[in-house]
Amino acid sequence: MSTAALVEGKIVQCIGAVIDVEFPRDSMPKIYDALILDGSELTLEVQQQLGDGVVRTICLGASDGLRRGLTVKNTAKPISVPVGKPTLGRIMDVLGRPIDEAGPIESEHTRSIHQKAPAFDELSPSTELLETGIKVIDLICPFAKGGKVGLFGGAGVGKTVNMMELINNIAKEHGGYSVFAGVGERTREGNDFYHEMKDSNVLDKVALVYGQMNEPPGNRLRVALTGLTMAEHFRDEGLDVLFFVDNIYRFTLAGTEVSALLGRMPSAVGYQPTLAEEMGKLQERITSTKKGSITSVQAVYVPADDLTDPSPATTFGHLDATVVLSRDIASLGIYPAVDPLDSTSRQIDPNVIGEEHYTITRRVQQTLQRYKELRDIIAILGMDELSPEDKLSVARARKIQRFLSQPFHVAEVFTGSPGKYVPLKETIRGFKMIVDGECDHLPEQAFYMVGTIDEAFEKAKKIQ
């Protein structure tokens, strides 16, 4: 469409990131239309029609220097971003513009960031397991190919490091394309992630979309949709794609900010009244169809470690597997700090993962649960008051707890020990030996920060 044909309007009010624009009454923009400020690249997205030709928009960029009376043009279509192979290896912003100073993105195709979720009869369920090489995840909450996974945790328990390790293990082994959406996280993490991908030579298979903490709420709200749109395009071309979001909570938070600016009444804990709908719109699109699959891993910040907060609670219902990171476990120095009793997966079913894996997982959880129940007694009366069976349970539980830790490739700088990738068979064999009592003679330190059970035996020899 030529710029001459664009309908023009005038700014009539600016309140922070919310801009009201007046258009001729017979040519008002539609909801979600993108408007462009004349003479600049600043984009506004229509959120409400107030009547009398006035629309209320949210600004996707800094609103510094805006004033009443400036001319705005209506593009008469929603925000569209480049999709396809030219986006791989590039860093883009919410509007799909490159921010890596490596020239323009030469993409033939663009796609609107607002898409309908696939119809129910187009969906394709999957039960094929996705091996991550992380013992605690493969054993307790295995991932499905084409499934949705959430990493839940408070501040500083290791969501981003866990996600980086998953990307490192899956993206390298997987060989397909990945899309990473950095939603309202630290720019430092975005930079680290870029270099991590570059150093491991998988950058040419990853599209990076960033709307970081320092950006206006409009950008943070829409950047998840931008990344998802790119992932959907690869899926619709018949590919299996990985979609990583860090952090889905910031998406909700940006929605809360926008909602308040638009003058909506807040609901529980001050969140937007449309929380469930906004989350549903995003999550229903992250799905696998008969054409291709999207396997998504989402980090979910848990405010004040409260899993019943409306934001994480709304996210729970959409996921196939939940990995809960616990501050108590992190404080023991056990990393990844995954809580084996709180984390769950829909794949934990003997018909899906097999009888042996299912039995071992349940036995490990029973042992840990028994230890949890006995902890108060031990704190008051000491170990001597326990029955011989309980003493054995506690000893095994402590070994299991330590064996659930693992050195990560992406954390080699901090730990000083090389990262370990543990195949699922080895994970099952190791935990089977512990619960069967074949490792009762080994000291519990031998199980800390090792890969396979054989390494624990080697470490025990050095200790003794």
Swiss-Prot record:
Main location, first listed in the record: membrane
Localisation per UniProt entry: Cell inner membrane
Single annotated GO MF: ATP hydrolysis activity
InterPro entries registered for this protein in UniProt: AAA+_ATPase, ATP-synt_VA_C, ATP_synth_F1_bsu, ATPase_a/bsu_AS, ATPase_alpha/beta_chains, ATPase_F1/V1/A1_a/bsu_N, ATPase_F1/V1/A1_a/bsu_N_sf, ATPase_F1/V1/A1_a/bsu_nucl-bd
Membrane protein topology class: Peripheral membrane protein
Keywords, ordered alphabetically: ATP synthesis, ATP-binding, Cell inner membrane, Cell membrane, CF(1), Hydrogen ion transport, Ion transport, Membrane, Nucleotide-binding, Translocase, Transport
Spans traversing the lipid bilayer: none
Catalytic activity: ATP + H2O + 4 H(+)(in) = ADP + phosphate + 5 H(+)(out)
Gene Ontology terms: cellular component: plasma membrane; proton-transporting ATP synthase complex
Known EC number: 7.1.2.2
Sequence positions that bind ATP: G153, G154, A155, G156, V157, G158, K159, T160
Function: Produces ATP from ADP in the presence of a proton gradient across the membrane. The catalytic sites are hosted primarily by the beta subunits.
Record's subunit section: F-type ATPases have 2 components, CF(1) - the catalytic core - and CF(0) - the membrane proton channel. CF(1) has five subunits: alpha(3), beta(3), gamma(1), delta(1), epsilon(1). CF(0) has three main subunits: a(1), b(2) and c(9-12). The alpha and beta chains form an alternating ring which encloses part of the gamma chain. CF(1) is attached to CF(0) by a central stalk formed by the gamma and epsilon chains, while a peripheral stalk is formed by the delta and b chains.
Membership in a protein family: Belongs to the ATPase alpha/beta chains family.
Annotated protein name in UniProt: ATP synthase subunit beta
Species of provenance: Burkholderia vietnamiensis (strain G4 / LMG 22486)
